């Protein structure tokens, strides 16, 4: 699938068009997520048991840049426990700058995640987005995508 998406971008969209993204498959029997990170700059796992966040980036490559992406595809996996959260976002979140020229960055994003772990996944994403908008005090200069997955069952 990753190779087909890469080929489509490379050969059907305007030259110089690139995409970042995460491809994931969830094994509900094993509570495991298998994923390929294609250049998403912020991919985090919140561990409820330890109340901490760690980056689980992977070694992916931006889509549409090379003809053959297969050498760059690395499947990673992470086991999820009840209350654990996967959170990913594009560079539009991290790199957006305030009026003073300060980027929102990973620290502010992680703080927003930790402060809102009790919310449903959809509300976590919108709360992080609203924190970004409040920080910027202006319109966004870049596109923003946020993905949140929360493990609810044992």
For each of these PLM feature ranges, what is it?
Residues 1-154:
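Conserved subregion of the PPM/PP2C metallophosphatase catalytic domain
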């Amino acid at each position: 699938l990753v190779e087909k998406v890469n080929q489509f971008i490379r050969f059907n969209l305007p030259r110089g068009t690139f995409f970042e993204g995460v491809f994931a498959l969830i094994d509900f029997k094993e509570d495991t997520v298998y994923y390929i990170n294609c250049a998403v700059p912020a991919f985090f796992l919140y561990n409820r048991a330890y109340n901490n966040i760690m980056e689980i980036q992977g070694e992916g490559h931006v889509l549409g840049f090379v003809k053959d992406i297969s050498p760059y595809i690395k499947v990673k996996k992470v086991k999820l426990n009840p209350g654990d959260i996967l959170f990913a976002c594009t560079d539009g979140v991290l790199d957006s700058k305030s009026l003073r020229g300060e980027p929102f960055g990973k620290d502010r994003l992680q703080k927003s995640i930790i402060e809102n772990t009790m919310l449903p996944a959809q509300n976590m994403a919108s709360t992080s987005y609203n924190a970004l908008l409040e920080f910027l005090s202006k319109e966004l200069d870049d596109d923003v995508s946020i993905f949140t997955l929360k493990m609810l069952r044992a």
